[in-house]
Amino acid sequence: MPDFYFPVRRRPGIMSVGRERARGKGINAMKTKITVIGAGNVGSTIAFMMSVKHTADEVVLIDINESKALGEAMDIRQGAPLAAQPVSVYAGSYRDAAGSDIVIITSGIPRKPGQTRMDLAQTNVNVLKEIAPEITKYAPEATYVIVSNPVDVLTYAFHRVTDIPAERIIGSGTLLDTSRLRSRLAEYLNVSEKNVHAYVFGEHGDTAFIPWSIAQV
């Protein structure tokens, strides 16, 4: 059996990918551990980019669909030999989040055509309420990054339903909007995105706005 298959004994059916490496066996002890909750398009992409850029030494993927999390972790793990510094990526349970430095929450019901982010508010707040007590029990010292939509509402809701200090709860906010704006301006002006300094402020949604007076190229 290949060395990256390691069953998680606590919960039959979940298999860890690279678990022995994550525990530091045979290599130096790992430094940074990040847990991603939600193995959908956003969560799996985040895990992949962290692996490619070596943002973390250990990445845990958690999803209600255990097979999905396992499949995504395996795909990332099997491409690891191509990276300069392979990262240990594996699927696990909330218990496996213990010791995480950062927890990124991407879980939630995706928007349907014609639906606004705010239409999802109550549905995804309920999802968050199920996740919050489980993850904070095992990773009480982590910094939490909320990505699920509506991100502003869910970031506030996470603060209200947990004991995590506000300074350790971060919402992705308009970061993606700002990135899209800079990319579009760079394309339109035929310049490098690194030379575009413009921002999107406000809510990540219909009320977001661009303060053009401070935009620079």
PLM region spans:
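Short, Lys/Arg-enriched N-terminal segments with co-localized hydrophobic residues
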Residues: 14-29
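Glycine-rich Rossmann-fold phosphate-binding loop(s) that bind the pyrophosphate
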Residues: 39-40
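N-terminal Rossmann-fold NAD(P) dinucleotide-binding loop
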Residues: 43-44
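Conserved N-terminal Rossmann-fold NAD(P) cofactor-binding segment
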Residues: 62-99, 115
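N-terminal Rossmann-like NAD(P) cofactor-binding module of classical short-chain dehydrogenase/reductase
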Residues: 101-104
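Rossmann-like NAD(P)(H) cofactor-binding subdomain of soluble oxidoreductases
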Residues: 116-182
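Mobile gating loops/cap/lid regions near enzyme active sites that modulate substrate access
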Residues: 183-217
